[in-house]
Amino acid sequence: MKRIQIIDSHTGGEPTRLVVSGFPSLGDGTMAERRDVLAREHDRYRTACILEPRGSDVLVGALLCDPVAPDAAAGVIFFNNSGYLGMCGHGTIGVVRTLHHMGRIAPGVHRIETPVGTVEATLHDDLSVSVRNVPAYRHAQGVALDVPGYGPVKGDIAWGGNWFFLISDHGQRVAGDNVAALTAYASAVREGLERAGITGANGGEIDHIELFADDPEHDSRSFVLCPGLAYDRSPCGTGTSAKLACLAADGKLAPGAVWRQASVIGSVFHASYERADGGIVPTIRGSAHLSAEATLLIEEDDPFGWGIGS
């Protein structure tokens, strides 16, 4: 029987499952190199943690790793039901909050290594977390697309740690009771991008679709469709970073000004940015709450031990 130790949290309603132990050794390379080893040789550990019967489509996994740099607090590899993520904002907030719960860090500034670079996270005295993300930028503005069943769509392509297609003029109602329609629309957009061969820089797959709408209490409300068909319950850290890159490029938000991004369920991130060569460096602040500590058990004769559909 195999055992995998986990600690679950949620950030603004979006769950993160931190894997503390039980995965095979991935070597001593960078987080990107270790992610590649995990994907190539041990992917069934991802599916065991994330897919049913132990997980769900909305769950994001985070494998805790020893960092390469001696001044880093931890390394982490993010994954979900469809594969691997370069970076995850809500997940980083959850990881930092959980590291404090484990007694590994105190309030202060900490460096976290990810497959797309090292991010700086500040654990505040109230246990909220600010994540200084990897650089973000807008790759293309006003990209036109024809989506069957919906007609013409125009959006921006931006990098915030993952690739996003951001749409403000979409005609959809961004609300928690309209998730099914939002999912269908965003999924059709993503399929349209793939059919048209539209990508991020260097052929990067645009696997996140982000829809924006006005919000009576905050600067914006968003719906984010993640890889697969799960939507982000949080405002999405990498998605908010991509949004800031577009706002900065359009001159609509000054460096240091706070942008309050609400999610489709009403949870909120506070975000700002500083300028950097070719783009911006965003900072996202939010809170995570602990929800479980558990040991996942994988019996040798369990036909679904490594996940349904794996």
UniProtKB/Swiss-Prot annotation:
It catalyses: trans-4-hydroxy-L-proline = cis-4-hydroxy-D-proline. The keyword Cytoplasm does not apply. The active site is at 88 (proton acceptor), 236 (proton donor). Substrate binds at residues 89-90, 208, 232, 237-238. It comes from the Bacteria. Keywords: Isomerase. It holds the Pfam family Pro_racemase. One of its GO terms (molecular function) is 4-hydroxyproline epimerase activity. Transmembrane segments: none annotated. Its EC number is 5.1.1.8. InterPro entries: Pro_racemase_fam. Catalyzes the epimerization of trans-4-hydroxy-L-proline (t4LHyp) to cis-4-hydroxy-D-proline (c4DHyp). Is likely involved in a degradation pathway that converts t4LHyp to alpha-ketoglutarate. Displays no proline racemase activity. This is 4-hydroxyproline 2-epimerase. It comes from Burkholderia cenocepacia (strain ATCC BAA-245 / DSM 16553 / LMG 16656 / NCTC 13227 / J2315 / CF5610).
